From Swiss-Prot:
UniProt catalytic activity: [GlcNAc-(1->4)-Mur2Ac(oyl-L-Ala-gamma-D-Glu-L-Lys-D-Ala-D-Ala)](n)-di-trans,octa-cis-undecaprenyl diphosphate + beta-D-GlcNAc-(1->4)-Mur2Ac(oyl-L-Ala-gamma-D-Glu-L-Lys-D-Ala-D-Ala)-di-trans,octa-cis-undecaprenyl diphosphate = [GlcNAc-(1->4)-Mur2Ac(oyl-L-Ala-gamma-D-Glu-L-Lys-D-Ala-D-Ala)](n+1)-di-trans,octa-cis-undecaprenyl diphosphate + di-trans,octa-cis-undecaprenyl diphosphate + H(+)
Transferase in keyword set: yes
Annotated gene: ftsW
Gene Ontology, cellular component aspect: cell division site; plasma membrane
EC class: transferase
Family note: Belongs to the SEDS family. FtsW subfamily.
Keywords assigned: Cell cycle, Cell division, Cell membrane, Cell shape, Cell wall biogenesis/degradation, Glycosyltransferase, Membrane, Peptidoglycan synthesis, Transferase, Transmembrane, Transmembrane helix
GO molecular function, one term: peptidoglycan glycosyltransferase activity
Lineage of origin: Bacteria, Pseudomonadati, Pseudomonadota, Gammaproteobacteria, Enterobacterales
UniProt name for this protein: Probable peptidoglycan glycosyltransferase FtsW
Ranges annotated as spanning the membrane: 14-34, 52-72, 79-99, 112-131, 141-161, 162-182, 188-208, 268-288, 304-324, 341-361
Length: 380
């Protein structure tokens, strides 16, 4: 008999890293939201209490979803996609308009952002499609176009909201997954050209997007108008320097920087925790992404294709969304309205991203269980 196999059932590093980011998120939401929470609700901890409530909900979600086998997601991928499309249609009918965008559905005191669910739903569907029709996608151009055409309908709904940021994250992740599946680089050229032309037309024809682009090129031309948010963000980052001003000592959060606790929370992180603190948080997010890639690689090696592609899609999603959020904060990209995963205030983003990571942990768990079963089979 061989010695007892010493394999941990869960990826503890992934679990602890996620938990640390969630706690950092609550801390930074508290610090960045106190002024606006007091002005609007006369309660300095209004947003903190809601964020903690989301974490409590996450605790129960974790216990439920961790027991859900990956086969459930594969079998029900089309239903999940249809539910996502239904909510995207619903938001256009009864959604609340915020800053010119229809992104929220509010029922009583509960609000949800359908675009967050759309990411998980589309990557679930795409992972199943790639796992079943990989040879068709790799060997002919029609097979390559099919998944892009299928996801184009929900993407159009996202553009109607408009939510260009989520659309870009989904497109980049989709193209990256197709590349990972073995598709030759030549097939991407016409698709990328179409995307570039379409994006350019959408920007030119939409005053909302065009203004964002113009303010991005040189925010200092109109620092108190169209370039106000970006200039305030850059001032926050510049003030933070290497070590930061200290937790709670941000000046820009005193309602100088709009969306300080949501889309632009990274600027407050840079101001209070400095370059070192900001880079540490980015490292932790990228650590989760690279763990996802490692898990995906192991799954593909074991020919568990759905789990492999799903794991890769989660890792790519986190990387692209983080890069776009940080890029807008530091002035490298136009404002997109995307949250910083696991950090920014907001229930929809926090819960959906956390569910994605729970799925990732479940994929890893099933791979470990397979190794344990294989060990005991050879042991007998």
């Amino acid at each position: 008999m061989k010695t007892k196999l010493n394999i941990k059932l869960y990826d503890e590093k992934l679990l602890w890293c996620t938990l640390c980011l969630l706690l950092i998120g609550v801390t930074m939401v508290t610090s960045s939201s106190i002024p606006i929470a007091y002005r609007i609700y006369h309660d300095m901890l209004f947003f903190t209490k809601k964020q903690i409530l989301y974490l409590v909900i996450l605790f129960f979600i974790f216990k439920i979803f961790l027991d859900v086998p990956i086969s459930f997601w594969q079998k029900n991928n089309k239903i999940i996609l249809l539910i996502s499309i239904s909510t995207l249609l619903l938001v256009l009918i009864i959604g609340n308009s915020i800053h010119g965008s229809l992104r929220w559905i509010t029922i009583s005191y509960v609000s949800m952002q359908p675009s967050e669910l759309s990411k998980l739903a589309m990557f679930c569907y795409l992972s199943n499609y790639l796992s079943q029709k990989n040879s068709e996608i790799v060997n002919n151009f029609g097979g390559f176009l099919k998944p892009i055409i299928i996801i184009s309908f929900p993407l159009i709904l996202l553009l109607v909201e408009p939510d260009l940021g989520t659309t870009i994250v989904i497109l980049l992740t989709t193209l990256s997954l197709l590349f990972i599946s073995g598709t030759k680089i030549q097939k991407f050229i016409p698709t990328i050209l179409i995307i570039v032309v379409t994006t350019t037309v959408l920007i030119i024809k939409s005053p909302y997007r065009f203004e964002r682009i113009m303010s991005f090129w040189n925010p200092w031309n109109d620092p108190f108008g169209k370039g106000y948010q970006l200039t305030q963000s850059l001032m926050a980052l510049g003030r933070g320097n290497i070590f930061g001003m200290g937790l709670g000592h941000s000046i820009q959060k005193l309602e100088y920087l709009p969306e300080a606790h949501t889309d632009f929370i990274f600027a407050i992180i840079g101001e209070e925790l400095g370059y070192i603190g900001a880079c540490t948080i980015l490292f932790m997010i990228f650590f989760i992404s690279f763990r996802a890639f490692k898990i995906g690689k192991i799954a593909l090696k074991n020919k568990i294709f759905f789990s492999g592609y799903f794991a890769f899609s989660i890792g790519l999603w986190l990387i692209f969304q983080t890069l776009i959020n940080v890029g807008t904060t530091i002035g490298l990209l136009p404002t997109k309205g995307l949250t910083l995963p696991l950090i920014s205030y907001g229930g929809s983003s926090l819960i959906i991203v956390s569910i994605a990571i729970i799925i990732l942990i479940r994929i890893d768990f099933e791979l470990r269980m397979k190794n344990i079963q294989a060990f005991y089979k050879t042991d007998i």
